[in-house]
């Protein structure tokens, strides 16, 4: 069996080859078919096609229901090629429904068709996203599109889940991870994090499902696990997931590696790890350099500018909630700088107040040791805000310290004044309503 992608001169040649592979009746042949069902493949032979001829040719090479399924597939490809996304989306919905009812539910103890079942689901997600873009800012319509796609794929997922067996040789479970990735992509867009979490927990309890999956599906799955860990504020677990994904993406796919790095880099920053400038330059991610420089310098003003100018980028990644926690890292850094300059575990609050104030004005605290001699006029509101910041740093365990109101000092613990960031606790703004 050849693994390369073939070009076809006609509908007849395409369907004849798919039919020959299908007669092999193994998942390897199924995977070969899958490669030729993606929208990324060349379907130049469709430019002069007649709808009637596809139906007739499909009946020559396939028995029911596959004649109907591949006929629909080529119709969808045509709609996609000519940007008729609404027609394509609704036709693809019917295709996936038909595959579920006439193949998954009917053909028992076989799984050779699962690879292209998964590809049909991926195609549905692609069309859902394209159609959603056409909906502009109509959030009700966009949600309806994603929900409709998710509901159809979920039915396939549940049926395969019910086919879970001790030996996966003939089980439909081999498609679970790929179907889960489709669901997670839609659930994240819908904000249905609990549904996504439920699917991922099922895979975690059945590790063999991960082991038997293709590398590409493993990478996508780990990315979704990483995003879910970020929402739970578990940076260590998120780092492990994104690192796995990055290591398993070949270097010839720089675009995919760049997407993963957009998640891995901020995750690493919250663990106290600064990316090299070379890495940022290689993948055109220098906007992260603004954050790392500001944090290193203890410059709140510079950090605020970085947050403001890159808010949209973080929002597109679905991690804008991380922006709320960057100031805490910077204030922690300032406390550490001041403690080193003072050379004592007991720091007068006026020194910290002065450092915080200068930082908000754009001064690099790390390179301005003379702030101890700077006189700043006290402002009641700013002093109260300063106190709140310190209390939050202590409450979140960013620093192990206490405030002495008797002599207006911050008293750092003798043991670990600045705990590892992996041990620090944060409050995710997304879950405030649940905690209230």
Predicted segments with their positions:
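Internal alpha-helical scaffold/solenoid segments in large eukaryotic proteins
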Residues: 177-181, 205, 212-231, 235-247
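"A position-specific structural signal for the A-helix of alpha-solenoid helical repeats
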Residues: 119, 123, 178-182, 217-224, ...
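Interaction-prone helical segments in low-complexity regions
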Residues: 185-191
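Charged, E/D/K/R/S-rich low-complexity terminal regions of large eukaryotic assembly subunits
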Residues: 1-115, 135-136, 150-158, 162-173, ...
